[in-house]
């Protein structure tokens, strides 16, 4: 087994038993693949069914009303973005690119005859069709400078669905749902009548739709019912027994007798195959029935007197005595009737026809028109056009390929081609037939929560739909323009207005429910947000109406949606996370991977199955035991089939799970010993990992699951090597790799990776990248070169490993509180950097422009000490609450001045009184260091000194970067040819004769550009030098071009909002240490608040004097059933012990052979998966041992982790008791505790619920306008609510004066509080109470009811 660069430095011991079959697919592919499909830029790869192409093809050609112009679509191109991703974030711009569409305008001769079209002219050009947002490499969008994610939506798939309502009668209904267009419903009522609805409007008979499709009453009956022939004569009535086999299973309503009057089959019996044979053998072809039975029947076809052409009876008329007499009169002794005798099937449609008052297609169309457009007078043309537009015109109605596939599959017919996306007559007939079958018990209703009936709509599809909406508006505009614009040579640009497209797309990205501000607490929260699947949003469910069934875990979720990770609040079950191996297929259905089983042998062939396919197979679990030939060991094994867990013979198994973790999401797969935790707690654990705050220094978890490196790799926060090569240069800002062109598929000699430094995330945490490679290191493609935030050697590291003791300590861990050691604070383990952004905007007001300046009236010099001459704070300044960050003045209205004031103003030239200080100040409760300042201003007034200074710094930095990049390229080019050219014969060189030998000394005097001008006699060498020369010159041109482009983007003027003159952004880094009140958690849902930070000397300690870091309450475990944390603590202790063992060996010797023995015992004495230490050289072994001193990292994959025996064996090797308990001593007294305590290493996280963000106090502040009471909440600088129950408490104590103060001056007594403030200033301690404002509000409300109520103050005066 080979190890990557980062893995060699720290190998994780893995405990999994199951073989590794399939790598976890790229975690962000659901985002990137979907948008790539929408935005197929490369026309050569075929854009036939890509998003943009198909929308444009469907929308064009557009024809003018008079038919003279036709606009055709030819092709499209997506241009280059104006700014790159980083610049867009800095400038608050959108990362997008212009869409240019090639349109062809065909002009026809207007004098031609009506039916002929003569082309007069064809004009083609590219037309700008708005800007399309581009996706970043990490699957996000930058909209107005902020990073956003478009969450995928799980919605009901297009197709037909049959359901049964929850009422007592249990009425059945069918619904045809298109991808876009009107919904069509059919439903039974309690009487068995079939009704139809279009778009949930008023219901009408289902047969009206059939008549509107052109079916006659006779054809409808023929389609939906059987007919039987009755013969009649003077003896009575007889029913012909045709199609006896169709009658099997039906209840007989009469005796069947043979010619001798022997009863063959009795009445009220269900007919069997044996009965049918008996009847045939007896030669019975008809049976006598009485008139009572005949009178319940109806005519199947119109009865016409052939002699006169007169209609005696219409189809569906009742059979009556008068009808029979009329038939006898014209000599008809046979009657074709609807078969109600042997089956009830035909009665539903027959009864519906009785209710249906329409007689033909025209009347049916009018009836539908009246339902959809009540009040509109129906005109013949509009009636037909409306009905056809509902279901039969593709621009208005589309089932899409998914809907057509589902409809054909559900109706079990392929009569309709899969390329037809509108409804056909046979579809509607088929749906009604299937509905009748379900009512008759011959079919099943659909399970709407089955993942075969719900599909994922990803970002590409949503943007495609928005684009279609915008293009539809553009299309209407084009038609109008064609008829309005009168120009000699009309061009496509003249008639296309692209604003509706831009508006539709902008609306979706800025205010759409599924376009969300990216959750960026840490890399895991980013990945999880991008893999989120929501059932909410437009066209989805609403959380108020969603019932329990929709939210519940369904059998088809297995391997597709995680059954664990979902929010805890009102959205529970509506927002899900994609399972780790799941993918979305071309139809939008979720698929899970399985290993194929052939003839009882499990192969390594992987097949992805959707929920629909999976129902038909028997699937074994990943943990099923196999022998060395991959055959099942046991004869009877546990499997899944059709959503049920079953035990079955191994010969019946068709597929097997790929991995034990395939049913859970990425976040849940990070929880070790997940299988030992209660599901509710795991849910909390998975959700809380997303809230972990990245700390100053990341530390890998000692006990992990092996999923850490996958999440870190796919999050995009680490820098990954693109090619094989050697590290040429490393500093904190960049890594330069000299590429090995022989092993890499690239012609680049150099790869340069720029690192992100101290960038603010969406959640105000600090994004910073640190290199982990050294100069001279050899790297492979895919190796981690630099760690991002919350990663350690390419592994996700959200918290720290702490030594935990499960014991009470003086009540400080009551109710999940956490007792922390002061060592944790001292070592800055949970210290985090938060970057806050403060913005100051100078606007043009009615009274004049606001100004950012250091010249501010009535402000002391000390307050301006941290500002530069432009009035903006210096970078590096330490700022406290109330400090000025940006000094700004705003003009205020001129006041009438007295002559004296005017004189003083003139003498002192004082203009201070007509401006007001509106500076940006540091908010209360915060302090930090200014790390960056950005200034954006319009060019109209010229740039300020600070803006020019920032601009110059950026240009100098860019120049330096590009110069360094070029220097590296030069050195790489030099080293690639130097050895070969020294000692070679010269063909031509300045200063040397032909045939001379080139020396190293001569080369040292020349710059590289002169080297490359030398030509050599050796042709092969000459060719190599020629290639190097070309590469060097191309690189020089490319770097100069890149610098010019960068310089242009830096100096380019900023587009500010209207009325804004200047915007200044100040970034302040705030350091937050852990303190009492902060929330912490483990990975098993074990959360708590820090109650006290205890000095190290007072903490309980072990026999060797090592103090523990944390005391947790043991009572928090039994009731919560998250035992995984105990197992994690035991395994963590073992890991720590193994680290100590390696450290002791290192202290004794640094010989690789001895260290290998220790590592062999540590890694390979326990567990099935061995570590190949032979793959590491001696130097790498030493580095590995140095990195393992703090503990040997262990991976225990979910559902396939370490067993109890493994943990005990490791504890023994690590030198601890196998029960994981030990004697602890009280730090205060030195005495041992009565009982042994469970001690171990647990991975603890600091969550983004910091006490600093919640602490808040107010003395005076803003008040509510109506009630005049103080506002609530920290954001409004509000006060503490003194509620009803608090009032009762004061009443109970009889604290009358305190109560009066609370309800008046401290709340809404306006006059009283002003007086009180004045009294405090004057040093008086009296309190005058007035009428509280809420009484005035009450009085006004009573007056609104017409009652004049007022307060009577007279008694007080008397």
Swiss-Prot record:
Q: Which domain of life is it from?
A: Bacteria
Q: Which UniProt keywords apply?
A: DNA-directed RNA polymerase, Nucleotidyltransferase, Transcription, Transferase
Name recorded for this polypeptide: DNA-directed RNA polymerase subunit beta
User: Which species expresses this protein natively?
Assistant: Francisella tularensis subsp. holarctica (strain OSU18)
What catalytic activity does the UniProt entry give for this protein? RNA(n) + a ribonucleoside 5'-triphosphate = RNA(n+1) + diphosphate
What does the protein in this record do?
DNA-dependent RNA polymerase catalyzes the transcription of DNA into RNA using the four ribonucleoside triphosphates as substrates.
**Record keyword Transcription present:** yes
Q: Which cysteine residues pair off into disulfide bonds?
A: none
């Amino acid at each position: 087994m080979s190890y990557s660069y980062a893995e060699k430095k720290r190998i994780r011991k893995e405990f999994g038993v199951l073989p590794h079959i399939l790598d976890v697919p790229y975690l962000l592919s659901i985002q990137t693949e979907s948008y790539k499909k929408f935005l197929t830029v490369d026309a050569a790869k075929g854009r036939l069914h890509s998003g943009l192409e198909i929308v444009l093809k469907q929308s064009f050609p557009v024809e003018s009303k008079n038919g003279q112009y036709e606009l055709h679509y030819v092709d499209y191109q997506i241009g280059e973005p104006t700014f790159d991703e980083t610049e867009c974030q800095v400038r608050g711009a959108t990362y997008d690119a212009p869409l240019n569409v090639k349109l062809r305008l065909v002009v026809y001769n207007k004098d031609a005859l009506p039916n002929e079209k003569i082309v007069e002219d064809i004009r083609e050009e590219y037309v700008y069709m708005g800007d399309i947002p581009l996706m970043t490499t990490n699957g996000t969008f930058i909209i107005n400078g902020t990073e956003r994610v478009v969450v995928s939506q799980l919605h009901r798939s297009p197709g037909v669905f049959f359901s049964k309502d929850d009422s007592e009668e249990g009425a059945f209904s069918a619904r045809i749902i298109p991808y876009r267009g009107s919904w069509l419903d059919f439903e039974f009522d309690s009487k068995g009548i079939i009704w139809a609805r279009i778009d949930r409007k008023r219901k009408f008979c289902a047969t009206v739709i059939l008549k509107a499709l052109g079916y006659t009453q006779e054809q409808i009956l023929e389609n939906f019912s059987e007919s039987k022939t009755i013969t009649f004569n003077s003896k009575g009535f007889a029913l012909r027994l045709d199609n006896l086999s169709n009658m099997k299973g039906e209840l007989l309503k009469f005796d069947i007798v043979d010619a001798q009057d022997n009863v063959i089959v009795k009445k009220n019996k269900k007919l069997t195959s044996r009965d049918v044979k008996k009847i045939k053998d007896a030669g019975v072809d008809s049976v006598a029935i009485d008139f009572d039975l005949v009178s319940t029947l109806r005519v199947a076809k119109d009865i016409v007197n052939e002699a006169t052409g007169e209609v005696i009876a219409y189809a569906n008329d009742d059979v009556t005595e008068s009808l029979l007499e009329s038939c006898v009169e014209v000599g008809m002794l046979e009657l074709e009737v609807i078969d109600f005798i042997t089956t009830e099937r035909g009665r539903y449609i027959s009864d519906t026809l009785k209710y249906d008052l329409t007689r033909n297609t025209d009347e049916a169309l009018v009836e539908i028109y009246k339902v959809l457009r009540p009040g509109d007078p129906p005109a013949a043309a509009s009636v037909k056009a409306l009905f056809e537009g509902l279901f039969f015109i593709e621009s208005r109605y589309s089932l899409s390929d998914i809907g057509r596939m589902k409809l054909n599959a559900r109706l079990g017919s392929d009569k309709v081609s899969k390329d037809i996306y509108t409804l056909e007559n046979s579809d509607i007939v088929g749906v009604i037939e299937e509905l009748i079958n379900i009512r008759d018990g011959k079919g099943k209703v659909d399970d709407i929560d089955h993942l075969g009936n719900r599909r994922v709509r990803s970002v590409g599809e949503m943007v495609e739909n928005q684009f279609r909406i915008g293009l539809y508006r553009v299309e209407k505009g084009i038609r109008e323009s064609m008829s309005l614009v009168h120009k000699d040579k009309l061009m496509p640009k003249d008639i296309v207005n692209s604003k509706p497209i831009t508006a539709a797309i902008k609306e979706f990205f800025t205010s759409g429910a599924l376009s969300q501000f990216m959750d960026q607490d840490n890399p895991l929260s980013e990945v999880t947000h991008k893999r989120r699947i929501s059932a909410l949003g437009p066209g989805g469910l609403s959380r108020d109406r969603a019932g329990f069934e929709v939210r519940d875990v369904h059998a088809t979720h297995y391997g597709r949606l995680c059954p664990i990770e979902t929010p805890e609040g009102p959205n529970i079950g509506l927002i899900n996370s994609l399972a780790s191996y799941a993918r979305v297929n071309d139809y939008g259905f979720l698929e899970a991977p399985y290993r194929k089983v052939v003839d009882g042998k499990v192969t390594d062939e992987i097949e992805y199955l959707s929920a629909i396919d999976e129902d038909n197979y028997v699937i074994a679990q990943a943990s099923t035991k196999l022998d060395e030939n991959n055959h099942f060991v046991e004869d009877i094994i546990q499997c899944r089939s059709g959503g049920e867990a079953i035990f079955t013979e191994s010969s019946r198994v068709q597929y097997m799970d790929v991995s034990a973790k395939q049913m859970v999401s990425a976040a849940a797969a990070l929880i070790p010993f997940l299988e030992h935790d209660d599901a509710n707690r795991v849910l909390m654990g998975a959700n809380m990992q997303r809230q972990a705050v990245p700390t100053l220094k990341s530390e890998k978890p000692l006990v992990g699951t092996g999923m850490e490196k996958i999440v870190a790799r796919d999050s995009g926060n680490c820098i990954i090597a693109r090619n094989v090569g050697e590290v040429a240069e490393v500093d904190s800002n960049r890594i330069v790799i000299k590429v090995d062109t022989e092993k890499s598929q690239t012609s680049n000699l150099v790869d340069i990776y720029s690192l992100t430094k101290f960038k603010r995330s969406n959640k105000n945490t600090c994004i910073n990248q640190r290199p982990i490679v050294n100069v001279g290191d050899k790297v492979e493609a895919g190796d981690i070169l630099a760690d991002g935030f919350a990663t350690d050697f390419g592994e996700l590291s959200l918290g720290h490993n702490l030594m935990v003791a499960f014991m009470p300590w003086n009540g400080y861990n009551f109710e999940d509180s956490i007792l922390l050691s002061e060592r944790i604070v001292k070592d800055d383990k949970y210290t985090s950097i938060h970057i806050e952004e403060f913005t100051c905007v100078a606007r043009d007001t009615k009274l004049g422009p606001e100004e950012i300046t250091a010249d501010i009236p009535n402000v002391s010099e000390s307050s301006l000490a941290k500002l530069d001459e432009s009035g903006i704070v210096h970078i590096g300044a330490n700022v406290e609450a109330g400090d000025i960050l940006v000094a700004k003045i705003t003009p205020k209205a001129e006041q009438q001045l007295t002559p004296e004031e005017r004189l003083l103003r003139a003498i002192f030239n004082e203009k201070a009184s007509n401006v007001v200080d509106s500076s940006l100040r540091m908010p209360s409760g915060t302090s930090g260091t200014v790390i960056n300042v950005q200034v954006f201003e319009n060019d109209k007034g010229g740039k300020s000194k600070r803006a020019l200074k920032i601009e110059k710094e950026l240009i100098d930095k860019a120049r330096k970067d590009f110069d360094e990049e070029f220097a590296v390229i030069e050195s790489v080019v030099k080293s690639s040819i130097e050895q070969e050219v020294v000692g070679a014969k010269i063909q031509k060189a300045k200063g040397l004769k032909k045939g001379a030998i080139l020396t190293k000394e001569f080369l040292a005097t020349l710059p590289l550009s002169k080297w490359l001008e030398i030509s050599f006699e050796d042709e092969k060498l000459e060719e190599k030098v020629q290639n190097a020369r070309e590469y060097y010159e191309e690189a020089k041109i490319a770097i100069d071009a890149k610098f010019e482009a960068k310089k242009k983007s830096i100096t380019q003027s900023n587009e500010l909002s209207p009325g804004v003159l200047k915007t200044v952004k100040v970034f302040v880094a705030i350091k937050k240490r852990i303190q009492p009140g902060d929330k912490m958690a483990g990975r098993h849902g074990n959360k708590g608040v820090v109650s006290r930070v205890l000095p190290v000397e007072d903490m309980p300690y072990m026999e060797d004097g090592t103090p523990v870091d944390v005391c947790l309450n043991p009572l928090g475990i039994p009731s919560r059933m998250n035992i995984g944390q105990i197992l994690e603590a035991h395994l963590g202790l073992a890991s720590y012990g193994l680290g100590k063992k390696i450290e002791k060996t290192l202290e004794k010797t640094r010989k690789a052979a001895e260290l290998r023995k220790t590592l062999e015992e540590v890694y390979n004495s326990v567990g099935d998966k061995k570590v190949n230490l032979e793959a590491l050289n001696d130097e790498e072994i030493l580095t590995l041992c140095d990195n393992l001193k703090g503990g040997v990292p262990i991976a225990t994959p979910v559902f396939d982790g370490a067993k109890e025996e493994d943990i005990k064996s490791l504890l023994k090797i690590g030198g601890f008791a196998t029960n994981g308990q030990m004697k602890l001593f009280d730090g205060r007294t030195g005495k041992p505790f009565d009982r042994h305590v469970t001690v171990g290493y647990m991975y603890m996280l600091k969550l983004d619920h910091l006490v600093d963000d919640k602490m808040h106090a107010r003395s005076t502040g803003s008040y509510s306008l109506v009630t005049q009471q103080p506002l609530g909440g920290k954001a409004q600088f509000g006060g503490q609510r003194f509620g009803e129950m608090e009032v009762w408490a004061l009443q109970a104590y009889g604290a009358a004066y305190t109560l009066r103060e609370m309800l008046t001056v401290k709340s809404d007594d306006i006059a009283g509080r002003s007086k009180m403030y004045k009294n405090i200033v004057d040093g008086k301690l009296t309190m005058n109470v007035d009428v509280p404002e809420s009484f005035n509000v009450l009085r006004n409300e009573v007056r609104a009811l017409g009652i004049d109520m007022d307060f009577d103050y007279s008694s007080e005066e008397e």
